[in-house]
Amino acid sequence: TPSHMSELLNVAHRLGATSLRTYTRHIGTVEEMMQKTVFDLSVVTGEACDLDVIIVLENHEDFTGSELLDIVERVDHPNLKILYDYGNSQMVLEDPIESLKVVLPYVYSVHFKDHVMIRADDAGQLTVAGVPIGEGFLPLTELTRCLLEQGLRRFTFENVWSYSAPIQEGRKALNGVNLGHGAFAYLDPPFDPARLVLRHSAHSPETLVDLEMCALN
């Protein structure tokens, strides 16, 4: 909400932070979510400017690159930029490279991570799952090269072991997406829990901590 964003903008300012990352929490149709997000951001971008903080809107499992671009251009404020996450476009069945091409001029910072796809038969529904960097199917080299050539240096390395998210309901595969191939290649079972975990309840908390340390090492 704008009031929550205002509070966090002031926290960021007091900490000396130059940016504040956010993503939409709205529900509804895609257009409804976009309209509400535009409204919220339009309320707080002026305050962000006064505090010298850049708001970065993440492609957080909800919007395609063109939808995210549309939001930023509707708000039309220099203190609103985009946080590009390497894999989150997969949840809306958009190729990560195609998504980056669309939003690149507005990208301010980056989440660097790796993903695999899990078949519906193996996960209950078509699912994106996080794995240690380098063990997934995202085009890490090509994405990184494109971002570096654009001058981006704000990279955050994300540990997404045991993270998973379903494909958003109602989304259809966009141009360049071929399920089972490329960035959308399926990982075949059995699944090594040191690589990914789909069902946390199958392990004790102590085992999960040990497995995560194994994944990180």
Residue ranges and their predicted role:
Residues 57, 84-85, 113, 157:
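Active-site flanking residues adjacent to catalytic metal/cofactor-binding acidic residues
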Residues 21, 43-54, 84-88, 137-141, ...:
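Short, basic, helix/turn surface patches
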Residues 1-82:
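Active-site acidic/histidine proton-transfer and metal-coordination neighborhood
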Residues 25-27, 84-88, 114:
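Short, acidic/turn-prone active-site loops that include or flank metal/cofactor-
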